[in-house]
């Protein structure tokens, strides 16, 4: 039954259980027990389970995702407003409970250059997180990140290398 719920595999060979992009989020909410069931099934079949939590940190599923996590990767763009949102999220986690504080302190922040402005803005944002999380990594601007489905082989070599550094940072936490 689980394979029938998964997105069709593509070149990445990754299975994906995702929301329906043709429906509003309000029609696809899952609650605590549903999340726990999904996590239980996923953990039975997969050694690594990744969640793209969205940005509704007040949602029950978001809190359960945090409670089920061993590593947080906090993405942000190289701009003040998204960086402030990421910083506020980390602050809220630190205030939530001891486990959430530990997750925030050991988080990896990924700062992506969404426009071809050069690395200065990304470096300023990255500097704001250094010393507050385990690691801060930058992803250079790459037009392939803005042009439809992501494919690793369509990224520039520098972007591929940057994402490999992110993966290595995540792996070093285990």
Positions of predicted regions on the chain:
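P-loop/Walker-type NTP enzyme "switch/lid" segment
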Residues: 1-44, 147-150
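Short acidic catalytic loops
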Residues: 47-57
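Beta-strand-loop-alpha "switch" segments that mediate conformational coupling across diverse proteins
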Residues: 113-157
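Conserved beta-strand segments of the P-loop GTPase G domain that flank and frequently precede/overlap
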Residues: 24-26, 50-52, 74-78, 108-113
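NTP-binding/hydrolysis catalytic cores, primarily Walker-type P-loop NTPases
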Residues: 147-174
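Inter-motif core of Ras-like GTPase G domains
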Residues: 44-46, 59-80
């Amino acid at each position: 039954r689980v394979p029938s719920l998964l997105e069709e595999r593509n070149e990445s060979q990754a299975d994906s259980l995702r929301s329906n992009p043709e429906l509003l989020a309000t029609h696809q909410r899952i609650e605590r027990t549903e999340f726990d069931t999904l996590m239980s099934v996923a953990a039975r079949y997969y050694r690594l389970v990744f969640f793209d939590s969205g940005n509704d940190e007040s949602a029950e599923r978001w809190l359960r995702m945090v409670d089920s996590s061993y590593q947080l990767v906090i993405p942000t763009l190289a701009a003040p407003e998204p960086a402030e949102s990421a910083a506020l999220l980390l602050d809220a986690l630190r205030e939530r409970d001891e486990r959430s504080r530990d997750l925030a302190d050991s988080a990896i922040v990924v700062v992506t250059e969404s426009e071809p402005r050069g690395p200065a803005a990304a470096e300023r944002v990255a500097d704001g997180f250094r010393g507050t999380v385990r690691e801060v990594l930058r992803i250079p601007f790459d037009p392939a990140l803005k042009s439809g489905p992501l494919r690793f082989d369509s990224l520039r070599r520098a972007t591929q290398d940057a994402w490999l550094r992110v993966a290595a940072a995540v792996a070093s936490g285990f």
